[in-house]
């Protein structure tokens, strides 16, 4: 006759299984978990029975959140021993190694989130500070791009645009003054000499045709000026004096 071996049960524990395990442990104690699993009639392994008892069914377990003293002690012991959860659990009565490990992971996850939230406002404020200290208008950006595109010729172009020179509107009076300037002899002008002469006389100055029809010595150099005038648009026989 062939006996059919039942399959080992896995998954969540029921209330009936918890009661059977508690009664068996009270009878035989917390040892020989393979024997307890067999005697109790539970279709569970010895390891599963032990973990269920230690983490959930032990009467000395503490329930609820960690106290501040327990939290501080966990941090100190972990800094000293690392991830040796069973050794840390011995220093905290009523707390299991699995519970301590879960608390540590939750604590580290919360600490990482706080660090990330503290870093994000500082980075955004630094970018805003840089933008406020270094504003770049669209015209500045376009000017920089044009300067880079033309190989640095943007400065020359801007200077030429800012200081336009209108050669067509160059006054002819200024041209004649520049032509006559090198030939004028230094000394008092004719008007000053006329005033000084009038002041030196005791009586009133009599009218004399020479004063009204005086022509500067530039008229004597008519031939030389006619040669220069055509390059400025004047025809033959046209000069500064008539």
From Swiss-Prot:
This entry carries the following GO cellular component terms, namely: nucleus
Subcellular location per UniProt equals: Nucleus
ATP-binding: is it a keyword of this entry? no
Q: Which cysteines are joined by disulfide bonds?
A: none
Renumbered residue ranges of the record's region Disordered: 110-133
Q: Which keywords, in A-to-Z order, does the entry hold? A: DNA-binding, Nucleus, Repeat, Transcription, Transcription regulation
Q: Which SMART domains match?
A: SANT (SM00717)
Could you name the domain of life of the organism this protein comes from? Eukaryota
**What is the name of the protein in this document?**
Myb-related protein MYBAS2
The organism encoding this protein is: Oryza sativa subsp. japonica (Rice)
């Amino acid at each position: 006759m062939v006996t059919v071996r039942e399959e080992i049960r896995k998954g969540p524990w029921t209330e009936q299984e918890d009661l059977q395990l508690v009664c068996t442990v009270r009878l035989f104690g917390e040892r020989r978990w393979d024997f307890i699993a067999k005697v109790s009639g539970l279709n569970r392994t010895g390891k599963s029975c032990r973990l269920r008892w230690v983490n959930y069914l032990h009467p000395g377990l503490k329930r609820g959140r960690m106290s501040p003293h327990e939290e501080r002690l966990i941090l100190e012991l972990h800094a000293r021993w690392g991830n040796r959860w069973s050794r840390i659990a011995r220093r905290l009565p009523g707390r299991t190694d699995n519970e301590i490990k879960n608390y540590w992971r939750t604590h580290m996850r919360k600490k990482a989130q706080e660090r990330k939230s503290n870093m994000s406002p500082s980075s955004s404020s630094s970018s805003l500070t840089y933008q406020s200290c270094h504003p770049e208008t669209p015209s500045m950006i376009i000017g920089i791009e044009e300067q880079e595109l033309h190989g640095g010729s943007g400065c020359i172009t801007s200077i030429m645009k800012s200081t336009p020179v209108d050669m067509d509107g160059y006054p002819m009076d200024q041209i004649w003054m520049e032509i006559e300037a090198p030939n004028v002899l230094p000394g008092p002008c004719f008007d000053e000499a006329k005033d000084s002469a009038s002041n030196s006389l005791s009586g009133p100055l009599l009218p004399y045709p020479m004063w009204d029809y005086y022509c500067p010595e530039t008229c004597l150099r008519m031939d030389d000026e006619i040669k220069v005038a055509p390059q400025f648009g004047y025809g033959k026989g046209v000069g500064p004096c008539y």
